[in-house]
Amino acid sequence: MNTTLTDSQLDRWNQTGYIKLPEFLSEAETQNLREWVEEISAWPADDEKWMHHFEQTPSGVRPARTEYILAFHAGIRQLLTQGKIPDCAGALMGEPAILYKEKINYKYPGGGGYAAHQDAPAYEFIRNHITCSIAVDAATPENGCLFFTPELHQRGLLHLDKNGCIDREYADTLDWEPVPMQPGDALFFSSYAPHKSPPNETQQPRRTLYLTYNALAEGDLREEYYADKRRSFAQVDTTGGEKLKISKIGHFDGKPAQQT
């Protein structure tokens, strides 16, 4: 697609805090991404390299997320650091963008959802940041697409609870709009835009690539972010499944698990 954003798209972005761009990836790019995600999901656990996270589902322990991928996959590295994805992120931010973090959320059948939250509390090292999701599979309300409350992204952090999420009582008062996606669609959203997603209640996966970009002027802080994240995870007592973490905030509503 033409990645030049129109005035109406920019107006919608400024008003709502998010914008969906259908067919952002070409059919060939979408197929490549699907194959890459299949490859990455089959990588063996290696805590010195990429970071796999797992969850308990009705079908057993399945991958929930893989992150810190860039150095280990040339195709993913090129897609995320060159061309239309960082260019579009920069256009929406109003200045050049650089990748801050990357992850694949698999959300296999029975996979857990995510409580209402904003991404910003998890990003201590940056001020100007934006998230992009790319659909690998179709995302629907039934399999756990994202839901947003528009027009709240300029109010800063909203009623945070002890887990770094939006307080559930406050979240229940908001009007949530689903944003279904087709493979290859892109969804850009402010890290202050409140969003959530339900569990996957279908028999098909809802795999999505999530990317966060920060302003290049703030520096390349990706390695610093992941070093800090690894340190924080290393401090978690992993003797009980309920204490495992897949994120620096407690928004995951599934059941983190050790790989079996």
UniProtKB/Swiss-Prot annotation:
The protein's role, per its UniProt record: Part of an oxidative pathway for utilization of methylphosphonic acid as a phosphate source. Catalyzes the conversion of methylphosphonic acid to hydroxymethylphosphonic acid. Is specific for the hydroxylation of methylphosphonate.
Similarity field: Belongs to the PhyH family.
Gene3D superfamilies xref list: q2cbj1_9rhob like domain
Residues reported to bind Fe cation: 117, 119, 195
GO molecular function annotations of the record: 2-oxoglutarate-dependent dioxygenase activity; iron ion binding
Keywords from the UniProt entry: Dioxygenase, Iron, Metal-binding, Oxidoreductase
EC assignment: 1.14.11.71
Protein name: Methylphosphonate hydroxylase
Free-text cofactor note: Binds 1 Fe(2+) ion.
Known catalytic reactions: methylphosphonate + 2-oxoglutarate + O2 = hydroxymethylphosphonate + succinate + CO2
Cofactors that this protein relies on: Fe(2+)
Binding residues for 2-oxoglutarate: 107
One Pfam assignment: PhyH
GN (gene name): phnY*
